[in-house]
Amino acid sequence: MGTLTVNQNKLQKRLRRLAGEAVTDFNMIEDGDKVMVCLSGGKDSYTMLDVLMHLQKVAPIKFEIVAVNMDQKQPGFPEHVLPAYLKELGIEYHIVEKDTYSVVKELIPEGKTTCSLCSRLRRGTLYTFADEIGATKMALGHHRDDIVETFFLNMFFNGSLKAMPPKLRADDGRNVVIRPLAYCNEKDIQAYSDFKQFPIIPCNLCGSQENLQRQVVKEMLQDWERKTPGRTESIFRSLQNVIPSQLADRNLFDFTSLKIDETAASRFVNVVNL
């Protein structure tokens, strides 16, 4: 593509800076790492790969990048798109072929949400492949808005305070998942994808289903953001500023042992001047 406009240049610098800060803050990538970048063909994973390739050039450490896409044998999946794009970039890549589509269609009744099962099957396959190629980190393209949405989904439907951590050791103990776009917002990623003209591959399984719980939460947050700009960022910051003593989880704070501090100095309160 040609020379970037002033706004495009600012956007690119902002995404690179925020991704770099997230990588540094959470020690996502270390010297000698082999980072498996999971590509779905969507705007988020393309942007993540683009940003990580830049960081690889400028970072004070050395690390490998291996791009991996999983062909789940969805009808109409354009198999040629990602190989052509990745060959042009000149980076190592693998296409993992596994027919999870048939499994999902067999197990999930028509009209029901397939996202959860599809995601679990894909994740398990990618964990196994990461182990096979000796990847030390597995990079996913989730961004700030995904993290906040997940926080509310868990609160509303699971009764738990958890989201998507920027860095996570998988349950198998053999994979470390990183989310380099954790500080980046979806609006910026969409704008970046538009001007970079990434060859987007739509998700035919889950993208066509209406009224998913995540979509409802997304629309709620978008409505809040329209009414009060900056609210999503404030919510995200709250996930980095947890105060266990002000919540009600007895596993995080010892409420049972909480007593008056007999050594504390007395404090005189002038009730007249209150």
UniProtKB/Swiss-Prot annotation:
Binding site for [4Fe-4S] cluster: 115, 118, 206
Protein encoded by which gene: ttcA
Assembly mode: Homodimer.
Location of the protein in the cell: Cytoplasm
Motif PP-loop motif mapped to chain: 40-45
Family membership: Belongs to the TtcA family.
Main location: cytoplasm
Organism whose genome encodes this protein: Pseudomonas fluorescens (strain Pf0-1)
EC number: 2.8.1.-
Alphabetical UniProt keywords: 4Fe-4S, ATP-binding, Cytoplasm, Iron, Iron-sulfur, Magnesium, Metal-binding, Nucleotide-binding, RNA-binding, Transferase, tRNA processing, tRNA-binding
One Pfam match: ATP_bind_3
Cofactor info, note text: Binds 1 [4Fe-4S] cluster per subunit. The cluster is chelated by three Cys residues, the fourth Fe has a free coordination site that may bind a sulfur atom transferred from the persulfide of IscS.
Catalysed reaction, written as an equation: cytidine(32) in tRNA + S-sulfanyl-L-cysteinyl-[cysteine desulfurase] + AH2 + ATP = 2-thiocytidine(32) in tRNA + L-cysteinyl-[cysteine desulfurase] + A + AMP + diphosphate + H(+)
An example Gene Ontology biological process: tRNA thio-modification
Function: Catalyzes the ATP-dependent 2-thiolation of cytidine in position 32 of tRNA, to form 2-thiocytidine (s(2)C32). The sulfur atoms are provided by the cysteine/cysteine desulfurase (IscS) system.
Pathway named in the protein's UniProt entry: tRNA modification
Note in the entry: The thiolation reaction likely consists of two steps: a first activation step by ATP to form an adenylated intermediate of the target base of tRNA, and a second nucleophilic substitution step of the sulfur (S) atom supplied by the hydrosulfide attached to the Fe-S cluster.
GO molecular function: 4 iron, 4 sulfur cluster binding; ATP binding; magnesium ion binding; sulfurtransferase activity; tRNA binding
Names of required cofactors: Mg(2+); [4Fe-4S] cluster
Stored InterPro entries: Rossmann-like_a/b/a_fold (IPR014729), TilS/TtcA_N (IPR011063), tRNA_Cyd_32_2_STrfase (IPR012089), tRNA_thiolation_TtcA_Ctu1 (IPR035107)
NCBIfam families referenced in this protein's UniProt entry, alphabetically: PRK10696.1
Protein name: tRNA-cytidine(32) 2-sulfurtransferase
